[in-house]
């Protein structure tokens, strides 16, 4: 096609689609007895782009990463926790393979595999869920189980979780139905005692009951604005059977429950087998042996445990693992701060003894990887405050004494400052 303003007879030309004359548009492209303007070309491109967006979920499903690929991607961002990564990779792959095949295979209905993550604070539960969502390019939202109450009580309804997921994808129901929901602090909604209580437990067992249908799969009616304040609005129908739910919690004390079960029958008195200190299992080793009966004793109701068939346990991070977290992942904390300082034209160096000191401090605080950022932020706060007002600083060096609070980071100046100090 060629760009023409007039035909051979000098006649004024018009766009065959919108009817605008050649003087009202920038370009008029001619074909055999037909013309199209640049504005209509742009409009056609927009229409095509929208259609591509609509079919993109199907394209994504056909290119579902394998469990090995999922595991390798997790390795780039999450240090350690190898058993949990393997469990997650298989569970996530099977979930999206199930969606791709329409919940059935050769007439056999495929069950839903929601996931329960058990591990101490700062061990990487949330990071694993976030990283999976980024890899699969699906909507992701987080909810805090401690804020949830069953319907009719002051607090957040469980349906609001789906409303948050819809917000993340501009209320596109099809996208939301392929999303991932991470519910944190799930251990905090455990039943307050082993026996059913006479008084209503609206934030414990009541929330577990409210979450049952949502996690298993139901058609949730969600208003675009959320909550119960806009009853006149048309509700969106969301099929939660296609949403992957990942629940996580520290489950403090669960190791003792597991230990009691394992040691039952070992006997007491003269015939008992006395275990030495070296034979005692660590918390991580005990958690890896968790059984449904242990979770029931901890306070989760059997029906709720049944909706979370895939269980992955995470161990407490060691000092070496924390040092690796500081420097090895793609978005490692030290790399983030180095990128931040580079925006000021300054190089930032963390010495090895500084990384060890940061890890030791985090271990002492018992906050896992979550506490690393606050330690680094505290050590660099004054420097980040002063640096934009300073000239000729080329490099900032952080050593062990900086982390201990005994000295400020070392500032290395460039040539102009060196000359000035020499004079």
Curated annotation (Swiss-Prot):
Component of the ClpX-ClpP complex. Forms a hexameric ring that, in the presence of ATP, binds to fourteen ClpP subunits assembled into a disk-like structure with a central cavity, resembling the structure of eukaryotic proteasomes. The keyword Ribonucleoprotein does not apply. Zn(2+) binds at residues 15, 18, 37, 40. This is ATP-dependent Clp protease ATP-binding subunit ClpX. One of its GO terms (molecular function) is protein dimerization activity. It comes from the Bacteria. The keyword Zinc-finger does not apply. Belongs to the ClpX chaperone family. ATP-dependent specificity component of the Clp protease. It directs the protease to specific substrates. Can perform chaperone functions in the absence of ClpP. It holds the Pfam family ClpB_D2-small. GO terms for cellular component: HslUV protease complex. It comes from Yersinia pestis. PROSITE patterns: CLPX_ZB. ATP binds at residues 120-127. Residues 2-56 form the ClpX-type ZB domain. Keywords: ATP-binding, Chaperone, Metal-binding, Nucleotide-binding, Zinc.
